[in-house]
Amino acid sequence: MALVPYDENVLPALSKLHQSSAEFTLANHRIRLSQDWKRLGVAAVVWDAAVVLCMFLEMGKVDLKGKRVIELGAGTGLVGIVAALLGANVTITDREPALEFLTANVHENIPQGRQKAVQVSELTWGENLDLYPQGGYDLILGADIVYLEETFPALLQTLEHLSSGDTVVLLSCRIRYERDERFLTELRQRFSVQEVHYDSQRDIHVYRAVKNKSNTEL
């Protein structure tokens, strides 16, 4: 996973990434997440895209009660945690190095009565997808997972595998570079995509995608 070096004195707003924890009030709960930039880098801090996606879920425009939800590239687990607090049955995934850290955040923030509704699992995009049910989810969530162009083919393959014709994909991201636009172009070749929310303060877009009928496995 790539790290982008920066001078903390030049970009003081990014100093929050080096804090050992981050706190939020979402889904009527106080959520406290551990962060560990030095050990795990970008996977272990809360990015604006995750916060915006959580706020979008709070709006109630997506029915989460009892739904089968999977989060990709979960990092700190914020989005999956909020989805679970809003009533979903959630599989929260990331690569193996982040799992211990991710699991601790989940256990810390999910009430005992909801623990069985949440599963933390290893998922490297494009690998061992047969471990996950093909088209087996109502909702796929991803926050700030569109940034490394070399991962785009595997991410698209994973989205296709996990999606049925009824699955909704919600991706929250900042469009930084031409490569981000290229990903959206490739996504639109396989999914029907529309922007459903934009946070102008944070410059974060939320996209809704549903697999094109011609690409739905029979």
From Swiss-Prot:
* EC number annotated for this UniProt entry: 2.1.1.-
Tell me where it mainly resides: cytoplasm
Tell me which Gene Ontology terms the entry assigns under biological process: protein methylation
The keyword Transferase appears for this protein: yes
| Gene Ontology molecular functions | protein-lysine N-methyltransferase activity
Q: Which Pfam families match?
A: Methyltransf_16
Keywords linked to the UniProt accession: Cytoplasm, Methyltransferase, S-adenosyl-L-methionine, Transferase
Binding annotation for S-adenosyl-L-methionine:
47, 73-75, 94, 125, 143
Which EC class is this protein assigned? Answer: transferase
* PANTHER family for this protein: HEPATOCELLULAR CARCINOMA-ASSOCIATED ANTIGEN, PROTEIN N-LYSINE METHYLTRANSFERASE METTL21A
Protein family:
Belongs to the methyltransferase superfamily. METTL21 family.
Per the entry, what this protein does is: Protein-lysine methyltransferase that selectively trimethylates residues in heat shock protein 70 (HSP70) family members.
This one is known as Protein N-lysine methyltransferase METTL21A
Please name the gene that encodes this protein. Answer: mettl21a
